[in-house]
Amino acid sequence: MLLLNKRYQIIRPLTINITRQTLNNYINDTTLIDIEKLIKLSELLKRNIDYFYKDNFVFGNYLFRSDSEVDNITKVKFEERIRKYIEVEKLVGKKTIPYMLDVYLEKLDKEFIETIAQNLRRFWNIGLLEPINNPINLLELNGIKVLQFSSPDHEISGFSAFNDKIGYCIYLNSNNTIERQFFTSIHELAHFIFNRKDYKTELSAKENEGKEKIANYFAGVFLVPKDSLNKFVEENYFKKIDFKEVCLIKKYFNVSAECIIKRLFQEGKIDKANYEMLRNEANEKVGSFGEREPIEKKDFIDNFRFNNLVKNAYMENRITTSKLAELLNIRMDEANREAEKWLN
């Protein structure tokens, strides 16, 4: 809950572009404050942004695991959106706490990880040979909350959070390529499976490189299973694999060139020299955060499940247009246009 004491009612609401009533709603915790206004408020009161949350963040032990240091503003923005997600789930009666495999693993065991990946694919009824069209949709279909918004730092590819009450939540940096977001989503899934007890204390990849290797290997074999990769290579008569073949394979599996090159090397389809040559070619002109022949962003919808839940809540008259604007973090005129589009 926000620590907006009554003494802050002396603030002129116009200084942060809100009405006095809205400020009172923030104080009384009847309206969620959006991150942009919270930043302005923190600057006005000369307080760090985490000051406004009890015990630093609203979920207490709902801590974050990430492969890069995450600033408090990004964490608060994530928690703000998770609270909206939970709110709209309750409105439409769609709250889910998924069943999750729980296998603690500290050291890389490739055979064991492949077995777990195969078991989960079976459990989620996706088979062992078929490519996954959209891993993010797959996670959300199985009760994992995924939220996407932009961060200027490409090093922050994503992070995850968990507790028994709220469940499993993943953030993905929407500034990154679709392929990178797909891989990151399954990387974070691996942490839920193999490192769940680590969410009791905040960790980073730098503190435990071994657990990142486990998560990366799981993501690779889950998205590109060995038998499926071998079958595709054999059926297409790839005797020598150049970058042209890499692009064909990556498009089939909906992953990055980097992921495919690594899986080809792991399965003995290319040698070390070819592996290095293909990696260099993959990064040529686009850098390590770009993608050659990428999945088009226009074919991909951010926050698909959350937006559909909001739409359902509005269509069922469970929320007003102003609440729609608040949940989607858009202006009232945009909310009116969106509502009109849904109704027509």
Stretches with model-predicted labels:
Residues 1-344:
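Active-site hotspot residues in diverse enzymes, especially metal/ion-binding acidic/histidine motifs
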